[in-house]
From Swiss-Prot:
This is 55 kDa cell wall protein. Its main location: secreted. It is found in: Secreted, Cell wall. It comes from the Eukaryota. One of its GO terms (cellular component) is extracellular region.
Length: 9
């Protein structure tokens, strides 16, 4: 689950 807290670069 990608969120702004865990950005997938």
């Amino acid at each position: 689950e990608a969120t702004v807290d865990m950005p997938l670069d």
